[in-house]
């Protein structure tokens, strides 16, 4: 839906802009205002009370969503020998080193996550300028540089997502699909909030969750009560 389309305006009119919705109510509103032409992706945008310019306030991490993401995740793995075999058996979409790196250097980035064994990182560094800006560069902090590639592939395929605050202290994450129940979306939201609370920098002062908005692909944003940090599936 274009923000100027009749369908978008009709959907936006269903949202009470002056209300702060509970996570469950927000999920219900997002489902009701999502496109009926396809199974839209549901996302959340969170503005954190941090200063990303300070290294100790650069919030980033991963979380396994209890209900998955609802989308097919394409995973590539930089590995050789037994590790490559393990990655293939775990369901990785593309596994390799030299040929894979050459393919990426040629502009191919048709995948959602990249994993590498530690011994391959020097080679992977050759495509850092391609992967980095897209958030695809393997990193030990997100569990994507590992010797247990099978576990990493299984986790990502099963609903593990990565998140990172941007320069404006905003963070975006997928919560699932509009076909999910509102309870499933609220549970996934709760898992993300729990992990963000665990990662809260000790040097961060004031309100940690400044603004939270839930929305579907091209749908209107639904303001979420940013003071709710538990009991995510309770009714309003």
Swiss-Prot record:
Lineage top rank: taxon: Bacteria
Single GO MF descriptor: structural constituent of ribosome
Sorted UniProt keywords: Repressor, Ribonucleoprotein, Ribosomal protein, RNA-binding, rRNA-binding, Translation regulation, tRNA-binding
Organism of derivation: Corynebacterium jeikeium (strain K411)
GO CC annotation: large ribosomal subunit
Function: Binds directly to 23S rRNA. The L1 stalk is quite mobile in the ribosome, and is involved in E site tRNA release. Protein L1 is also a translational repressor protein, it controls the translation of the L11 operon by binding to its mRNA.
Listed HAMAP family: Ribosomal_uL1_B
Subunit structure, interactors included: Part of the 50S ribosomal subunit.
GO biological process: regulation of translation; translation
Cited Pfam families: Ribosomal_L1 (PF00687)
PROSITE patterns in the cross-refs: RIBOSOMAL_L1
Protein name (database record): Large ribosomal subunit protein uL1
UniProt family annotation: Belongs to the universal ribosomal protein uL1 family.
């Amino acid at each position: 839906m274009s923000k100027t389309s009749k369908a978008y305006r009709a959907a936006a009119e269903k949202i009470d802009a002056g209300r702060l919705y509970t996570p469950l109510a927000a999920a219900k509103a997002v489902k009701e205002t999502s496109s009926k032409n396809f199974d839209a992706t549901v996302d959340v945008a969170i503005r954190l009370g941090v200063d990303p310019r300070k290294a100790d306030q650069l919030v980033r991490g991963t979380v396994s969503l209890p209900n998955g993401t609802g989308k097919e995740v394409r995973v590539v793995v930089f590995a050789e020998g037994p590790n490559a075999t393990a990655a293939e058996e775990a369901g990785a979409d593309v596994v390799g080193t030299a040929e894979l790196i050459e393919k990426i250097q040629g502009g191919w980035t048709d995948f959602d996550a990249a994993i590498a064994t530690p011994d391959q990182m020097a080679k992977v560094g050759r495509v850092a300028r391609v992967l980095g800006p897209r958030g695809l560069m393997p990193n030990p902090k997100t569990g994507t540089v590992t010797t247990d590639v099978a576990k990493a592939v299984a986790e990502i395929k099963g609903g593990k997502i990565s998140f990172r605050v941007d320069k404006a202290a905003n963070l975006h994450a997928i919560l699932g699909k509009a076909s999910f129940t509102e309870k499933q979306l609220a549970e996934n939201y709760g898992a993300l909030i729990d992990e963000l609370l665990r990662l809260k920098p000790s040097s961060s002062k004031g309100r940690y969750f400044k603004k939270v908005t839930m929305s579907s692909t091209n749908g209107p944003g639904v303001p979420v009560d940013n003071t709710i940090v538990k009991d995510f599936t309770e009714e309003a």
